[in-house]
From Swiss-Prot:
Lineage per the UniProt record: Bacteria, Pseudomonadati, Pseudomonadota, Gammaproteobacteria, Vibrionales
Keyword Nucleotide-binding set for record: yes
A GO cellular component annotation in the UniProt record: cytosol
Catalytic activities: UMP + diphosphate = 5-phospho-alpha-D-ribose 1-diphosphate + uracil
Cofactor: binding details: Binds 1 Mg(2+) ion per subunit. The magnesium is bound as Mg-PRPP.
Record protein name field: Uracil phosphoribosyltransferase
GO molecular function: GTP binding; magnesium ion binding; uracil phosphoribosyltransferase activity
Modes of activity regulation: Allosterically activated by GTP.
GO BP: UMP salvage; uracil salvage
Entry keyword set: Allosteric enzyme, Glycosyltransferase, GTP-binding, Magnesium, Nucleotide-binding, Transferase
Catalytic class of the enzyme: transferase
């Protein structure tokens, strides 16, 4: 599995700000969008381009444009919505596919409850966004669903990943690509990433 930990100074700086324990909902939400935007820049670096002739200000001119890539952004509800706009800043024409999965707090197993996928998803590159890759169950279940529907070009964008989640994802789906702002130390006994960000969904939505 291709694993990219994006170590750009802006990414490290913004993620560091997100780790503050008393960060406001507004600030956390803004930073989640900004980091997602920077991850998108990295995740699309392998998109092919082609020469296209357009009418410029002084006549025809050849320009580079992305070659035939249809993209769908796949936020995992609910926390993934906090990263969606960061992707759409760069790919505003992307279709949105929504997958609802929550983690059972006792068993830590993923529980699917909703999905609405873009049309012709088998022809699209899926960019799955979720702030945390902890145990990996929700991400694996989402990718299972996408592959069942014929989507086999999948990139995963997360703010923070735990080694345990990376290992689980690689075992289940070695063909996907993972882009993360940080690979943290470990999971604690409650399945939270340490040092992590805390509950990203609560911080994005202002709930507890």
């Amino acid at each position: 599995m291709k694993i990219v930990e994006v170590k750009h100074p802006l990414v490290k700086h913004k993620l560091g700000l997100m780790r503050e324990g008393d960060i406001s909902t507004k600030r956390f939400r803004e930073l989640a969008t900004e980091v997602a935007s920077l991850l998108t820049y990295e995740a699309t670096s392998d998109f092919e381009t082609e020469k296209v002739t357009i009418e410029g200000w002084n006549g025809p001119v050849q320009v580079d444009q992305i070659k035939g890539k249809k993209v769908t952004v796949v936020p995992i509800l609910r926390a993934g919505l906090g990263m969606m706009d960061g992707v759409l800043e760069h790919i505003p024409s992307a279709r949105i596919s929504v997958v609802g999965i929550y983690r059972d707090e006792e068993t830590l197993e993923p529980v699917p409850y909703f999905n609405k996928l873009a049309t012709n998803i088998e022809e699209r590159i899926a960019m799955v966004v979720d702030p945390m890759l902890a145990i990996g169950g929700s991400m694996i279940a989402t990718i299972d669903l996408l592959k069942e529907k014929g989507c086999n070009q999948i990139k995963v964008l997360v703010l923070v990943a735990a080694p345990e989640g990376i290992a689980a994802l690689e075992k289940a789906h070695p063909d996907v690509e993972l882009y993360t702002a940080a690979i943290d130390e470990k999971l604690n006994d409650k399945g939270y990433i340490v040092p992590g960000l805390g509950d990203a969904g609560d911080k994005i939505f202002g709930t507890k």
